[in-house]
Amino acid sequence: DWDRAFEGVAWFHITGITPAISDKAATLTLMACQAAKRHGVTVSCDLNFRKKLWTSAKAQQVMRPLMQYVDVCIGNEEDAKLCLGFTPDADVEKGQTDAHGYYGIFKGMMQEFGFKYVVSTLRESKSASHNGWKALSYDGQQFYESKHYDILPIIDRVGGGDSFSGGLIHGLIAYDGDQARALESAVAASALKHTIPGDFNMVSREEVENLAGGDASGRVQR
């Protein structure tokens, strides 16, 4: 009973992994998103393409129709290309993280799907244990690029995407739609997760806020 499930709910988050599991899971994801919108619930989606679960063609067949129900779309350049068919004007294969390469794709996604926010993480892979990390968001009027983090050493990348989404959702709710503060919260939360083993981001709100509001020139420290 999706309508009952969404009574009193403010936010619903999905990822591209769930509909990739099976056709039934894809149908249920669509039904959930439709019910969420009927109840005025904000819907966010981390595209999160997984090539072991489905092909790009199948992903686009399923994910593109879902986007009409999504308010906040999260994904890197590969996700946008493989799930939605958008390609940035940036040489991402060489680790380029120039935010300007994403402006065109963000505008195109916003125009086609009517998102409230489009958000992407930008990773610069220097080595397996050393990454640069930042993010970019667009609200249809302004682009915002977060501060850059130098993460060394990386302890565990698992959970980095989920911690980013969680930080973004928290920020958009707590800071009343302030995309700059929300994005800084998301990037800081994810940067901290890279320094923690395991799936869960075992940090406090205070730690995230301190990092988000601190000096952007230093390395991530805990």
Positions of PLM-derived features:
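Active-site catalytic microenvironments for nucleophilic, acid-base chemistry
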Residues: 35, 171-175, 192
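Ribokinase/PfkB-type carbohydrate-kinase core domain
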Residues: 1-144, 148-152, 177, 201-210, ...
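Phosphate-handling active-site elements
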Residues: 142-145, 171-185
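Residues forming the Rossmann-fold NAD(P)(H) cofactor-binding site
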Residues: 166, 184, 188
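Short, small-residue alpha-helix embedded
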Residues: 154-179
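Short arginine-rich
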Residues: 190-201
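Short glycine/serine/threonine-biased micro-segments
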Residues: 14, 157-159, 196
